[in-house]
């Protein structure tokens, strides 16, 4: 005969508790205990709060069961020669889910050194030549032209 290995999955204690108490996961909302003297609007709000609280509890129980029972299950190999226990671990138990890194930022535009150097070298000086021009044309000469000469500003 050829060697045949048989594997059996043995549940953890938490799995057994969950299978024995399925009503803990599904809890119907009962509004019989509400006082009849309360207004209808108040009763609706209170029942909504109870439902939300129950849903949160159910979600927490499910998460605890799923997280706790994943890594604790064991596979057992029944072989004639050597019984071996192999712990089952989830695929991504050691790795932590990280958000992807942000894309690199676009660098700010820096004016090139060539252009900046040109502005530094060109020390531009604006000269006020209005006085020199007026000195070239005295007021006595301007009266002869009939005030046809006008000052222009740049």
Swiss-Prot record:
Biased composition range(s): Basic and acidic residues: 74-83
UniProt entry keywords in alphabetical sequence: Cell cycle, Protein kinase inhibitor
Region (Disordered): 1-111
Keyword Cell cycle: yes
Organism classification: Eukaryota, Viridiplantae, Streptophyta, Embryophyta, Tracheophyta
The protein, known as: Cyclin-dependent protein kinase inhibitor SMR14
Keyword Membrane: no
Bias type Low complexity, positions: 24-37
GO terms, molecular function: protein kinase inhibitor activity
Domain of life: Eukaryota
Task performed by this protein: Probable cyclin-dependent protein kinase (CDK) inhibitor that functions as a repressor of mitosis in the endoreduplication cell cycle.
């Amino acid at each position: 005969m050829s060697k045949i290995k048989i594997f059996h999955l043995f549940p953890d204690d938490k799995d057994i508790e969950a299978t024995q108490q399925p009503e803990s996961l599904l809890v119907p909302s009962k509004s019989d205990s509400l006082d009849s003297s309360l207004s209808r609007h108040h009763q609706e709000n209170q029942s909504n709060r109870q439902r939300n609280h129950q849903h949160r509890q159910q979600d927490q129980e499910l998460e605890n069961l799923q997280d706790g029972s994943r890594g604790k299950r064991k596979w057992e190999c029944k072989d004639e020669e050597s019984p071996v226990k192999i712990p089952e671990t989830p695929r991504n138990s050691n790795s932590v889910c990280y958000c992807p890194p942000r894309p690199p930022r676009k660098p700010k535009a820096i004016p090139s050194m060539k252009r900046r150097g040109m502005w530094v070298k060109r020390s531009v000086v604006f000269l006020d030549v209005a006085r020199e021009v007026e000195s070239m044309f005295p007021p006595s000469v301007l009266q002869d032209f009939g005030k046809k000469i006008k000052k222009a500003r740049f």
